[in-house]
Amino acid sequence: MGLTSQLIPTLVCLLALTSTFVHGHNFNITIKEIIKTLNILTARNDTCMELTVTNIFAAPKNTTDTETFCRATTVLQQLSTHSCSNKLLGGLHRNLKTMANMTCSVNEVKKSTLRDFLERLKAIVQRKYYRH
């Protein structure tokens, strides 16, 4: 009986450490996938890159990365019905949604091209990756 009561705290600690490792590992995989996808998309030279999208980066400077990812997810969701939507944009949307883990609205009036949107998003994601 004494051995069991000593093992329980040890097992709980090991479980907590394992979940932290898995979360950090998944985060690194997700952020690397996002960067890879953004690199592929921004290298394209097709008419879809000239689509007009909401400029979420015109928001206040004190916007957190999570809020930015949430807003980017919303913009990509709005593109999902467009003929330019493809598997890469869909995958980017899914990965950003896991990073944001919340829903939000986008009300900005300013617009930018999809290329500019993706380039600025790539810079933010890369910064987050190097800080992590």
UniProtKB/Swiss-Prot annotation:
GO terms for biological process: B cell activation; immune response; interleukin-4-mediated signaling pathway; negative regulation of inflammatory response; positive regulation of DNA-templated transcription; positive regulation of macroautophagy; regulation of immune response. Disulfide bonds join 48-84, 70-104. The keyword Secreted applies. Glycans are attached at residues 28, 45, 62, 101. GO terms for cellular component: extracellular space. The keyword Metal-binding does not apply. Belongs to the IL-4/IL-13 family. This is Interleukin-4. It comes from Ailuropoda melanoleuca (Giant panda). The gene is IL4.
